[in-house]
Amino acid sequence: MSVDFQAETPSACARATAGRVLNMPARMSGGGGGTGPAGIAWQRGMAKQTSKIQSFEVMVLGAGIVGVATALHLRRLGLDVALIDRTHPGAGASFGNAGVVQRNGFVPHGVPGSARELLGILFRQSSAVSYDLATLIRLLPWLRRHHAAGGLRAADLYSRVVAPLRAVAVQEHLDLARSANADRFYRQGGWLHLYRSGSCYDRDEAERYYARVFGAAYEELLADEIGILEPGLKIANSRAASLKAIHWTESCSVSNPGAVVDAIWRTFVREGGEYFRADARQLQHKRGGWRLEGERGTVFAGKAVIALGAWSQDILKGLGESYPLAVMRGYHMHYRPLSGASLSRPVVDMEHGFVLTPTDNGIRLTTGLELAERDAPPNPNVIALARKRAEDLIPLGRPLQEAPWLGARPCLPDSLPVVGASPTIPDLWMNFGHAQDGFTLGPITGRLLAEQIAGKSPLLDPSGLSPLRFVA
């Protein structure tokens, strides 16, 4: 394949900390200076930075899939748009996720919050949830709030807000990908939720119930059926008597999430959008709009969109607005499977929280949640424990990276993102807090926000995602 960004070299991954790639190699930064389509796109996207002040209708801060999709939808609605990040588009959590576009996901994300759950992780670190003790203590109020949002009434509300998004998420992804010539990275075939015990399977009954309510198709598989669907899994060594799986048939996945975001960004540039490198912490609210100093000049826009993921709160606090945003970290590592073993779709171990995804660069192992400070050093034990559990299922060979990738997921206590206008600051818009759903929901929430900014009727009712729900 010819996309420069997909060449995930060990040195690049070793330098990736907290979801940002440091000192990115020239090829991975878009081939600047090249004469092919990638180099031309980069030059065009950066060319207008030479003027001292440039004015736009909207500046989008954050170039992960959420920000890139928002910017492209705004551009296609006829607005003059600047996309801004401090590094290459798609270099954060959008780069390192499991690459699944979920049709399922009707219950709030499984972050521990009850006293029983907290005691469980306190005395037993796992690949599903690991923690730094000081961070765990600091997050206790947030975790209790999250636990309350997982009650029956709150969970029912969550399902009804998220169900319309799930219903269109796959198609929105595919439409955007086709227009960006990135559909070659997508594969059908769904993904597997693997359960090693009956009790683990029973705990997920609410997910299956809401799937039936909202028409999301799935298949229940026993051990022998799992082995037929994924012969590369070591079913015989995985307590086959109790092994079950749910095959979410309408989900899809990608072989290279970073390349998908890169392709969408390049399409934004080809269609007349502008890209700037700048530090969003320098954002200033001036009369009539927003001002930000970039590497090669000043960017001014009438409206600003905060799509900075786990860094969104840093900017908003300086502007006098605050949201209960917590950060959950996650890791990935690529391996070359032994003995010719392979997977044809992502597989998630529901008991241990890791995902095995076939990618262009081998099998990607992504971990569960780590409760630690966003910018704290990586904890190598997290990926080591996940690998130990994963090798029960597939024989993993040597790592294809020097060190694990580490990313930060922005989480709100009700497990829903904020998408809409600031309730207190004029001409400020938000699109962040997607937790583990950024890759799935980025294209659709980007469209919904763009339609609101442009004064169009949104495809779906966005009121359930409004920032107003956090106004006291």
Q: Language model features by range: what are they?
A:
Residues I53-G64:
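Beta1/beta-strand and adjacent pyrophosphate-binding region of the FAD-binding site
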Residues G67-V68:
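N-terminal Rossmann-fold NAD(P) dinucleotide-binding loop
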Residues R76-F95:
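Glycine-rich FAD pyrophosphate-binding loop
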Residues A98-D224:
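Dinucleotide-binding Rossmann-like beta1-alpha1 core, especially the glycine-rich loop
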Residues V100-V101, G105, H109-A148, H285, ...:
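Active-site substrate-recognition segment that forms the wall
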Residues L157-V170, H193-R203, I246-R266, P377-V382, ...:
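Short beta-strand to alpha-helix junction loop
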Residues D202, A206-F214, A241-G302:
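Helical element adjacent to the flavin cofactor pocket in flavoenzyme catalytic cores
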Residues Y218, E351, D392-A472:
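C-terminal catalytic lobe of FAD-dependent flavoproteins
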